[in-house]
Amino acid sequence: MPLSKVEHYLSYHTRLLLPHVLSLQSSHRVAYIFSLLSAVSTGFITLISLYSQPWQKHLNYSSWQINTIASMTNLGMYLTPPILGMIADSHGPITLSLLAIIGFIPSYSYLAYVFNHPELSLGGNGDSSFNLSIICFVFIGISTSALYFSALLTCTKLYPHTKLLSISLPTTCYGISSVVGSQLLRIKWFWSSNASSSSSNSDLNLGRVFQTFALVYVVIGLLAWIATSVVSLLHFNEEQDNQKRLDDQTDVEQSPLLERSNHVQEKFTQTMLRIFSDPVTYILAVSILLSLGPLEMFIANMGSLTNLLVQLDAPTLSTKLLSTYALSSTFTRLLTGIVADFFAKKKISIKWILLTFLSLGVCAQLFLLKMTSSASPWGLVPTGSLVGIVYGGLFTVYPTLVLLVWGERSFGTVYGSLLIAPAIGSMIFCMLYAKFYDSRCMSGGGDLRNPSCISAVYKYSSIAFVVSAVLSAVVFWKLKSRKLRI
């Protein structure tokens, strides 16, 4: 298929310039490095867990408002992959890099302006300011998925024959990004003393943070544009070669090709209808909702939970907790991929990996329940590490399971559709957390009460993980009855 008009115009000047500046091999390498840098920046969205305390102190946001922001961000991230995949297939990954630029830069610029002008949130226009902030975070969520898919597709198209370069490294870079971001925010320039407080503790200055992110994405957007233009150049050259070969063929030879193409498209449509009428698809979706929903809740409310348990020096502990979580998640993604390949060679079912991570998820929720019930912060960082292990493991096992059950051709559509489940799960559990936090954990004077006020949330999340494990077992039982060896 030739370049679409959109892809043609977006990549036109870069395609003309690149062959005069770099060789084809050098273009490959530069584009790949730029794509990895893009992937490293996509996980900055996870830093939202560090924004809770500054929002509460500086803009008087309630936990409900903060969790609304987190939920809408996740909806933007998880509801759009099927659409973004269709756009990328039709117009190339360069369109996704453009969407990311359009979404990130104005959104972060506006959020910085709102934080630097708290009167917008505290005055009569507070609702409109907050609503616009929600819209900005929806765009940031969409842009995060767009930039990540842009980087992933570019790596896949540049090195399609090696999973390490095409899948593992960009995925790992996404995991590392929250570590990079949390370390970046340790720089003193991002912190400022609260003049209205007698405490010597400093607060994160989100105005400076968001301004910095806007500038970072200007640079990253340019690098992503160059990287995706290389993919368009390769596609353009490939189409020219194919056209030359087609010109040498007769019309008689071309006719069966068209018939075969129509047959393949019809078969693909039938496969999609069969998949989305299969009960296993929906049982798996509910299992994903009940497991990833509580994990997204923990990530979004890491800062407020730390503040409940510790209160003194909570921002420092929140940063440490996020770094520990991110490192554990990144390491687990790599290790799970290696173990899954080993299991496949030894013909061991992947269900043991999935059920192990779900069991660890139950343990993590029970640890959080114990900590909040006893009002003891001991073990918070190790528990955060355990949550990172479960999160990274599940986000590696679930796509692997989809690939094994429904095949490579249907993978993008099926897995992209299943990502709606964690978006809904995140919204449900984040709103549950916010409801308990605002109604039980805040006194009339705005002071925090005993951490046990939030413990009921982790009872529900523990039950959710148990039900998720049971549903996963049902999925494997149904697949086994169909004689599918996974």
Curated annotation (Swiss-Prot):
<feature type="topological domain" description="Cytoplasmic">
    <location>
        <begin position="1"/>
        <end position="29"/>
    </location>
</feature>
<feature type="topological domain" description="Vacuolar">
    <location>
        <begin position="301"/>
        <end position="320"/>
    </location>
</feature>
<dbReference type="GO" id="GO:0022857">
    <property type="term" value="F:transmembrane transporter activity"/>
</dbReference>
<keyword id="KW-0926">Vacuole</keyword>
<comment type="similarity">
    <text>Belongs to the major facilitator superfamily.</text>
</comment>
<feature type="topological domain" description="Vacuolar">
    <location>
        <begin position="185"/>
        <end position="212"/>
    </location>
</feature>
<feature type="glycosylation site" description="N-linked (GlcNAc...) asparagine">
    <location>
        <position position="60"/>
    </location>
</feature>
<feature type="glycosylation site" description="N-linked (GlcNAc...) asparagine">
    <location>
        <position position="194"/>
    </location>
</feature>
<feature type="topological domain" description="Cytoplasmic">
    <location>
        <begin position="155"/>
        <end position="163"/>
    </location>
</feature>
<dbReference type="GO" id="GO:0000329">
    <property type="term" value="C:fungal-type vacuole membrane"/>
</dbReference>
<keyword id="KW-0472">Membrane</keyword>
<feature type="transmembrane region" description="Helical">
    <location>
        <begin position="280"/>
        <end position="300"/>
    </location>
</feature>
<feature type="topological domain" description="Cytoplasmic">
    <location>
        <begin position="89"/>
        <end position="93"/>
    </location>
</feature>
<feature type="transmembrane region" description="Helical">
    <location>
        <begin position="164"/>
        <end position="184"/>
    </location>
</feature>
<feature type="transmembrane region" description="Helical">
    <location>
        <begin position="68"/>
        <end position="88"/>
    </location>
</feature>
<dbReference type="Pfam" id="PF07690">
    <property type="entry name" value="MFS_1"/>
</dbReference>
<feature type="transmembrane region" description="Helical">
    <location>
        <begin position="457"/>
        <end position="477"/>
    </location>
</feature>
<feature type="topological domain" description="Cytoplasmic">
    <location>
        <begin position="407"/>
        <end position="413"/>
    </location>
</feature>
<keyword id="KW-1133">Transmembrane helix</keyword>
<keyword id="KW-0813">Transport</keyword>
<protein>
    <recommendedName>
        <fullName>Probable transporter MCH1</fullName>
    </recommendedName>
</protein>
<feature type="topological domain" description="Cytoplasmic">
    <location>
        <begin position="234"/>
        <end position="279"/>
    </location>
</feature>
<keyword id="KW-0597">Phosphoprotein</keyword>
<keyword id="KW-0325">Glycoprotein</keyword>
<feature type="topological domain" description="Vacuolar">
    <location>
        <begin position="51"/>
        <end position="67"/>
    </location>
</feature>
<feature type="modified residue" description="Phosphoserine">
    <location>
        <position position="255"/>
    </location>
</feature>
<feature type="transmembrane region" description="Helical">
    <location>
        <begin position="134"/>
        <end position="154"/>
    </location>
</feature>
<feature type="topological domain" description="Vacuolar">
    <location>
        <begin position="435"/>
        <end position="456"/>
    </location>
</feature>
<dbReference type="InterPro" id="IPR011701">
    <property type="entry name" value="MFS"/>
</dbReference>
<feature type="topological domain" description="Cytoplasmic">
    <location>
        <begin position="478"/>
        <end position="486"/>
    </location>
</feature>
<feature type="transmembrane region" description="Helical">
    <location>
        <begin position="94"/>
        <end position="114"/>
    </location>
</feature>
<feature type="transmembrane region" description="Helical">
    <location>
        <begin position="321"/>
        <end position="343"/>
    </location>
</feature>
<feature type="glycosylation site" description="N-linked (GlcNAc...) asparagine">
    <location>
        <position position="131"/>
    </location>
</feature>
<feature type="topological domain" description="Cytoplasmic">
    <location>
        <begin position="344"/>
        <end position="347"/>
    </location>
</feature>
<feature type="transmembrane region" description="Helical">
    <location>
        <begin position="414"/>
        <end position="434"/>
    </location>
</feature>
<feature type="topological domain" description="Vacuolar">
    <location>
        <begin position="369"/>
        <end position="385"/>
    </location>
</feature>
<keyword id="KW-0812">Transmembrane</keyword>
<feature type="transmembrane region" description="Helical">
    <location>
        <begin position="386"/>
        <end position="406"/>
    </location>
</feature>
<dbReference type="InterPro" id="IPR036259">
    <property type="entry name" value="MFS_trans_sf"/>
</dbReference>
<feature type="transmembrane region" description="Helical">
    <location>
        <begin position="213"/>
        <end position="233"/>
    </location>
</feature>
<feature type="transmembrane region" description="Helical">
    <location>
        <begin position="30"/>
        <end position="50"/>
    </location>
</feature>
<feature type="topological domain" description="Vacuolar">
    <location>
        <begin position="115"/>
        <end position="133"/>
    </location>
</feature>
